[in-house]
């Protein structure tokens, strides 16, 4: 969920609502998943989804980026805490994708975003999904505590 505005217009209620979805819900889900893994003596993988806006700085996205940045920090610490039990935690950091959340942007706004990428295009939703699938697989058994960028080379 995105709440976009400039910092001087910050609305605490809207910010809290966004944090409930983007930060607190994934945290609670992670807590319950790990408790279940411990109960059943199983190893596992947790994948969180962030946003390239954490790493680039776009006007009007400070609040949204802060929520995704919080999730990145949480995921890294989760990996450190639970790695010894065989639980891996990573973040996939997608670039701009054509989704319902981005559907209100004008062509000019989209083109400005594409201009900041090496491939000059929207990030493929399929490539993001395939990255998640890879991280969930045994092929990624040595990857934990990482932010994996799938962003068409956003610069």
Report the location of each language-model feature.
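Alpha-helical segment proximal to the catalytic Tyr-Lys
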Residues: 35, 39, 80-84, 141
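Conserved Rossmann-fold SDR core element
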Residues: 72-75, 82-97, 143-150
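Conserved mid-core segment of classical short-chain dehydrogenase/reductases
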Residues: 1-16, 35, 60-63, 101-107
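C-terminal substrate-recognition "lid" of short-chain dehydrogenase/reductases
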Residues: 27, 121-150
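Residue(s) in the substrate-gating loop at a strand-loop-helix junction
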Residues: 51
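Catalytic Tyr-X3-Lys loop
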Residues: 8-28, 47, 71, 114
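Active-site loop immediately N-terminal to the catalytic Tyr-X3-Lys motif
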Residues: 8, 56-62, 84, 120, ...
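Active-site helix of classical SDR
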Residues: 30, 67, 75
């Amino acid at each position: 969920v995105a709440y976009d505005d400039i910092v001087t217009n910050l609305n605490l209620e809207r910010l809290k609502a966004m944090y409930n979805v983007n930060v607190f819900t994934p945290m609670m889900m992670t807590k319950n998943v790990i408790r279940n893994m411990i109960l059943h003596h199983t190893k596992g993988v947790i994948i969180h989804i962030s946003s390239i806006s954490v790493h680039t700085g776009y006007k009007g996205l400070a609040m949204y980026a802060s929520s995704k940045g919080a999730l990145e920090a949480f995921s890294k610490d989760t990996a450190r805490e639970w790695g010894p039990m065989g639980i891996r935690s990573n973040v996939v950091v997608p670039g701009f994708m054509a989704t319902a959340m981005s559907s209100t942007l004008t062509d000019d706004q989209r083109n400005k975003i594409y201009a900041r990428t090496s491939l000059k295009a929207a990030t493929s939703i399929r490539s993001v999904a395939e990255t998640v699938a890879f991280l969930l697989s045994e092929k990624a058994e040595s990857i934990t505590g990482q932010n994996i960028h799938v962003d068409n080379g956003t610069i």
